[in-house]
């Protein structure tokens, strides 16, 4: 989603 929390989660998973 566009939520900041989800965004950080996606970034962590991406890296």
Curated annotation (Swiss-Prot):
Indicate the secretion signal residues.
none
A biological process from GO: positive regulation of mitotic nuclear division
On whether Transport is a keyword of this UniProt record, the answer is: no
Sorted keywords for this record are:
Antibiotic, Antimicrobial, Fungicide, Mitogen
Q: What does this protein do?
A: Has antifungal activity against M.arachidicola with an IC(50) of 125 uM, but not against F.oxysporum. Inhibits human immunodeficiency virus-1 (HIV-1) reverse transcriptase with an IC(50) of 60 uM. Has mitogenic activity towards murine splenocytes. Lacks antiproliferative activity towards HepG2 hepatoma cells. Has antibacterial activity against the Gram-negative bacterium P.fluorescens.
Protein name, entry field: Agrocybin
């Amino acid at each position: 989603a566009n939520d900041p929390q989800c965004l950080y989660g996606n970034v962590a998973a991406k890296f």
